[in-house]
């Protein structure tokens, strides 16, 4: 052990051996398992709450002038929740409707191979891997300059 850790270890040993004072009496043998686990009863949070008596820093404490703003905020949230609920209900009723189905034999393909108006005729050269068959640059591209 180092010299700095020795005082901490001694302090821990002294605190563990300190006698219990009358501030937290433990009934001898009487009580439930929870009483034995938490001998101080419902006052366990007192140490955590000490020093928290100031309410000025709390964001939940509103001054008198802002009470109206607080109520308006609640009303906005309530309206937003109602709108969201109505949208969800509308979507739910639409999703439960059965879709109109066509017989499988009459179904028309989404891509009409008869209509070739969207194709562009380029000519006899074919492009493979970015180069044309004749070795020249593809149409519309400038040759690289060194």
UniProtKB/Swiss-Prot annotation:
Q: Where is this region: Disordered?
A: 91-146
Propeptide residues, per UniProt? 54-146
User: Which residues does this entry mark as bearing Methionine amide?
Assistant: 50
**Cross-referenced PROSITE patterns:** BOMBESIN (PS00257)
Task: Please state where this protein is localized.
Answer: Secreted; Cytoplasmic vesicle, Secretory vesicle lumen; Cell projection, Neuron projection
- Residue span of the signal peptide, if any? 1-23
Recorded GO MF terms? neuropeptide hormone activity
Sorted alphabetically, the keyword list is: Amidation, Cell projection, Cleavage on pair of basic residues, Cytoplasmic vesicle, Mast cell degranulation, Secreted, Signal
Q: Which GO terms describe its cellular component?
A: extracellular space; neuron projection; secretory granule lumen
Q: What is this protein called?
A: Gastrin-releasing peptide
Q: Which organism is it from?
A: Canis lupus familiaris
Whichever gene encodes this chain, its name is: GRP
């Amino acid at each position: 052990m180092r010299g700095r850790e020795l005082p901490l270890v001694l302090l821990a040993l002294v605190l563990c051996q300190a006698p219990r004072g009358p501030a937290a009496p433990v009934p001898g043998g009487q009580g439930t398992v929870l009483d034995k686990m938490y001998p101080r009863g419902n006052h366990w949070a007192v140490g955590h709450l000490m020093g928290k008596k100031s309410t000025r820093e709390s964001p939940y404490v509103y001054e008198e002038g802002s009470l109206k703003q607080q109520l308006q905020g609640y009303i906005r949230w309530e309206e937003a929740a109602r709108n969201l609920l109505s949208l969800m209900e509308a979507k739910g009723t639409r999703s439960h409707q059965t879709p109109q189905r066509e017989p499988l034999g009459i179904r028309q393909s989404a891509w009409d191979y008869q209509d070739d108006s969207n194709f562009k005729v380029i000519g006899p050269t074919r492009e493979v891997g970015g180069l044309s068959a004749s070795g020249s640059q593809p149409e519309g591209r400038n040759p690289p300059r060194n």
